[in-house]
Curated annotation (Swiss-Prot):
Binds 1 zinc ion per subunit. This is Cysteine--tRNA ligase. Coiled coil: none annotated. InterPro entries: Cys-tRNA-ligase, Cys-tRNA-synt_Ia_DALR, Cys-tRNA/MSH_ligase, Rossmann-like_a/b/a_fold, tRNA-synt_1_cat_dom, tRNAsynth_Ia_anticodon-bd. It comes from Microcystis aeruginosa (strain NIES-843 / IAM M-2473).
Length: 480
């Protein structure tokens, strides 16, 4: 069975073939860390988490990178309003992000590069674009000359000649930078320093990077000049991903990514989510009312490229669905010996793969899981009330192991203690201290991506790190 993906770049479905057989490089545009994550972030992170899990299930070794944008006007504005620093705001919401993702069952990325940790690479890339004639300095800023890149618009399908400045949401007629630009569609690669804002030294003077160049530099630094899969929300297609392509491909002369995948946007009770409509919901607010895995199930039940509607009715239906899966998943813990062999049903796995291989049709894969879960629920009731089953117990064991395996692929895992089987208390204190030491060494070596990865790994296991003055790190286990 061949994995088929819808490629935004080609606007058609294509068979997936990685650059290197058996290995997949994957980059996700992450969050700008100025506030708590909302429903849109939940969908994006869950979808690409499951895509990564599924690729690994198929046997690929996946290197998955997700960035943090920690230099941005929104972060600066919040820092000014709270009389604190940009770094303090970023750290607070990065920590909050890890907490939210751990609750949703999103596995940590292999690295979390940040703009502030990639400044040398950003400046090198801007310099290279300037040397090749794709960028020009102007009064302390550096701009990308969009019309120099003949393929501009190939991802979004937008052509510059068809756009009017001020009408696209991309260029504002009262843009204060307009006087500095050679063309109204040019965008900033480097912004000159402003009073009261953080800035860094560069060949063009003190300043900070523009948003789009950050991701181009981080992709190159973490994964190379060309990657297999670049993902993100559909709202990033234009201008962000379009500009990433323009920057990276002008610099290298090579494709930035072979496959561009985008998840659809979020609606709340049929309306676009926005603060002005009063329906803006954070992940924390949502998880105060609903089981995180019910939220995950709702997300996976929708076609990932289409809009999804979060409503109380939909979330209640997803909650009921998660209860059904839980009842099926609990069968083995309640009714099977702990040493029964982990044999799975290949025919059921084939049906699961056949569904999901068609452009990540997770809903089709879930249908297979529900079929198994409902049978196991029925047979579990038979065992509880009649002491016997309609099917052979060995066959039911095979189906249960299949359900556990495929549920894990979708991140719909139930702890053994929920099935009335004792489990250990998790990662040991010694292992925690060992990882903290590794994180300390990474920070000393200025390997901040590894430091973030270790913190995320511990957070996923219910461990919160608290950095204190003097380089001391304390930890708390969830529930302590």
């Amino acid at each position: 069975m061949t994995l088929i993906l819808y490629n935004t770049l080609s606007r058609r479905e294509e068979p997936f073939t990685p650059l290197i057989p058996g290995i997949v490089s994957m980059y996700c545009c992450g969050i700008t860390v100025y506030d708590y994550c909302h429903l849109g972030h939940a969908r994006t992170c869950v979808v690409w988490d499951v895509v990564r899990r599924y690729l690994e299930y198929l046997g690929y070794k996946v290197r998955y990178i997700q960035n943090f944008t920690d230099i941005d006007d929104k972060i600066l504005n919040r820092a000014k309003n709270e009389h604190t620093t940009m770094a303090a705001v970023a750290e607070r919401f990065i920590e909050a992000y890890f907490e939210d993702m751990a609750k949703l069952g999103v596995r940590p990325a292999d690295a979390y590069p940040r703009a502030t940790h990639t400044l040398d690479g950003i400046k090198r890339l801007v310099y290279e674009l300037e040397q090749k004639g794709y960028a020009y300095p102007s009064d302390g800023d550096v701009y990308y000359s969009v019309r120099r890149f003949s393929d501009y618009g190939k991802l979004s399908g937008r052509k510059l000649d068809d756009l009017q400045a001020g009408a696209s949401g991309r260029v504002e007629t009262d843009d204060p930078e307009a006087i500095k630009k050679q063309d109204p569609f040019d965008f900033a690669l480097w912004k000159g320093a402003k009073s009261g804002e953080p800035s860094w030294d560069s060949p063009w003077g003190q300043g900070r990077p523009g948003w789009h160049i950050e991701c181009s530099a981080m992709v190159k630094e973490q994964l190379g000049e060309t990657i297999d899969i670049h993902v993100g929300g559909s709202d990033l297609i234009f201008p962000h991903h379009e500009n990433e392509i323009a920057q990276s491909e002008a610099a290298t002369g090579k494709p930035l990514a072979h496959y561009w995948l985008h998840n659809g946007m979020v609606k709340v009770a049929g309306e676009k989510m926005s603060k002005s409509l009063g329906n803006f919901i954070t992940i924390r607010e949502l998880l105060a009312k609903y089981d995180p895995l019910a939220v995950r199930l709702l997300i996976l039940g929708a076609q990932y490229r289409k809009p999804i509607d979060f409503s109380d009715e939909g979330l209640q239906a997803a909650t009921n669905g998660w209860h059904t899966l839980q009842e099926g998943l609990s069968f083995g813990y309640k009714h099977l010996p702990p040493d029964n062999p982990a044999i799975t049903d290949q025919e059921l796995e084939n049906r699961f793969q056949e569904a999901v291989n068609h452009d990540f049709n997770f809903a089709g894969g879930l249908a297979v899981l529900f079929e198994i879960a409902k049978e196991l629920r029925k047979e579990g009731n038979n065992l509880t009330h009649a002491g016997k089953t309609d099917s052979n117990l060995a066959q039911l064991a095979v189906k249960w192991h299949t359900l556990v395996k495929l549920s894990r692929v979708l991140g719909l895992e139930m702890a053994a203690d929920q099935g009335e089987t004792p489990v250990s208390e998790g990662i040991s204190a010694a292992d925690i201290e060992n990882l903290i030491q590794q994180r300390t060494e990474a920070k000393k070596a200025k390997n901040y991506a590894e430091s973030d990865r270790i913190r995320a790994e511990l957070k996923a296991q219910g461990i919160t790190l608290i950095d204190q003055p003097g380089g001391v790190t304390k930890w708390l286990r969830e529930g302590d």
